[in-house]
A protein has these predicted regions:
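Interfacial loop-to-transmembrane junctions
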Residues: 88, 253-276
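Membrane-embedded alpha-helical bundles of polytopic integral membrane proteins
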Residues: 25-234, 238
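Juxtamembrane boundary at the C-terminal end of a transmembrane helix
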Residues: 285-291
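Hydrophobic transmembrane alpha-helices of multi-pass small-molecule transporters
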Residues: 210-211, 275, 279-280, 288
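Acidic/Ser-Thr/Pro-Gly-rich, low-complexity N-terminal segments
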Residues: 1-29
Length: 291
């Protein structure tokens, strides 16, 4: 068989079009800049989180109250048309977290029940009372309030300082692993209606990263056996994507891309804490069973 005509490259020597090469380089540059922006946001946030966790006690609880108030403000702003009962939400948040600081999980449950008649009473005197407003306020209390209350409960357990850090490490390492894994290897959409950019491959890599992150952190804590660290890591790995997808659903229903602008292009407090609100709960019950 005759070879390719002189002057014309054969099939193996063909190069992709210049436009394709340029778009590939631009995509890689965007990925690097996006990762850099994530790190710029993450470093000061991690420093503040570590300071609160190490301080513990009432300082940690007050920090969670402030963080919860910011998260509630973002949620209520997204659902402003429902007329949420802001005062009831804030009072309930403070009650839940103080119950966690000075009581047990039973007292947290009592506070969650006690806030319901307060919510109904404040709804009646609102200018625009609505069932939708009650629903949004209750969602804020039982999503944001319960999640942060369990973070306080977790901090109060034996070795709570280290376990809270382990849960945060697993959550954020898993999130970063899912992001990078999805960018590099993702082909199959995970939940296209909720979050088009999430992939099955990213989910798997993120879960593996979360388990390994907690296990690796546990190797420097002689009071945390390897099997306990693996179980805790698995719980974090399973809970984190559920929290992420739940928040994506909330944003989709509200018709918004980000919950706020606290972290600039990387969204609001809820965008950064969506997974933590679930992993703190799971982490508490796993460690409470061991402790």
């Amino acid at each position: 068989m005759a070879g390719p005509t002189r002057g014309r490259p054969g099939p193996r020597s063909r190069r992709p079009p210049a436009s394709s090469r340029r778009s590939g380089r631009a995509r890689r540059r965007n990925q690097r800049s996006d990762l850099s922006a994530r790190l710029i946001v993450a470093v000061p946030a991690i420093a503040v989180a570590l300071a609160l966790v190490i301080s513990g006690g009432l300082v940690f609880t007050l920090g969670m109250i402030v963080l919860g108030a910011v998260c509630m403000h973002e949620l209520f702003a997204m659902y402003e048309r429902a007329h949420p009962v802001r005062l009831a939400g804030l009072l309930g948040l403070v009650g839940l977290l103080l119950a966690a600081q000075y009581g047990t999980q039973f007292h947290v449950l009592l506070a969650a029940v006690a806030v319901v008649p307060v919510l109904f009473g404040l709804t009646v005197v609102q200018r625009h009372p609505s069932a939708a407003g009650i629903a949004v306020t209750l969602m804020a209390l039982y999503w944001i309030g319960f999640g942060l209350a369990h973070a306080v409960l977790l901090r109060r357990l034996p070795h709570g300082e280290g376990i809270v850090i382990d849960v945060l490490v697993g959550t954020f390492v898993g999130d970063t692993g899912a992001y990078l894994g999805g960018r590099m290897f993702g082909t199959r959409p995970l939940a296209p209606r909720l979050s088009p950019n999430k992939t099955v491959e990213g989910l798997g890599i993120g879960m593996l990263a979360a388990v390994l992150g907690v296990w690796f952190a546990g190797r420097y804590q002689d009071w945390l056996p390897g099997t306990h660290a693996l179980v805790l890591g698995l719980g974090v790995a399973l809970a984190a994507p559920v929290g992420d997808l739940f928040e994506s659903f909330i944003k989709r229903e509200a018709g918004t891309k980000d919950t706020g602008r606290l972290f600039g292009a990387h969204g609001g407090a809820l965008d950064r804490l969506d997974a933590v609100l679930f992993t703190a709960v799971v982490g508490y019950y796993i460690w409470a069973a061991y402790a």
